């Protein structure tokens, strides 16, 4: 699901978001700018009805939801992602399967978390060290990003893209690509 872009402050339920809206307005932002600011950080984003399917009220309720539905619920919903191997839902299932895999469970669940390349902009990167060493990388920008590998890759465990551009000493992550690599 994506965040709901509020069209009016009347759609907002969270009191702290309403307060932030008024702070933004008092600082000189117009209504559209203030709504844009609060839409990004509002706690109501996590409180909107779950988009189960493309039926009325996204399959969430037969009544009136307390918050508005995201208008994209016909395209983005659980039912549309359940059988799509490239969906975010499927990627989460793969993450959970990795966590439960007896070969990696000790490292994923109990391994030491060690930051890696903390200064590289828009990159999430860290090790999980236990009986194995895993490197988790996430590119959080629109452009590809080259990441130096500390050692050769033994195995790519997870990848949210069909391909990975990897060599012995670096990996090129596409925009918003996330991988888990065993070193």
Where are these regions (language model features)?
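Short hydrophobic beta-strand that contains or immediately precedes a catalytic carboxylate
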Residues: 137
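Loop/helix patches that line or flank the sugar-binding groove of alpha-linked glycan CAZymes
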Residues: 1-134, 142-144
């Amino acid at each position: 699901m994506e965040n709901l872009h509020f069209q009016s402050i009347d759609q907002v339920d969270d009191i702290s978001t309403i307060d932030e809206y008024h702070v933004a307005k008092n600082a000189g932002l117009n209504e559209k700018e203030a709504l844009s600011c609060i839409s990004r950080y509002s706690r109501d984003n996590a409180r909107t009805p779950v988009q189960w399917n493309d039926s009325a009220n996204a399959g969430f309720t037969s009544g009136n939801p307390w918050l508005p539905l995201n208008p994209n619920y016909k395209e983005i919903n659980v039912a549309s992602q359940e059988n799509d191997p490239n969906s975010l839902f499927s990627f989460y299932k793969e993450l959970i399967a990795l966590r439960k895999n007896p070969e990696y469970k000790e490292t994923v669940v109990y391994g030491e978390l060690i930051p890696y390349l903390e200064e590289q902009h828009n990159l999430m990167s860290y090790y999980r060290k236990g009986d194995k060493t895993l490197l988790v990388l996430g590119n959080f920008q629109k452009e590809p990003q080259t990441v130096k590998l500390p050692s050769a890759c033994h195995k790519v465990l997870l990848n949210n893209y069909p391909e990975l551009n990897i060599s012995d000493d670096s990996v090129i992550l596409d925009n918003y690509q996330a991988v888990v690599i065993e070193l």
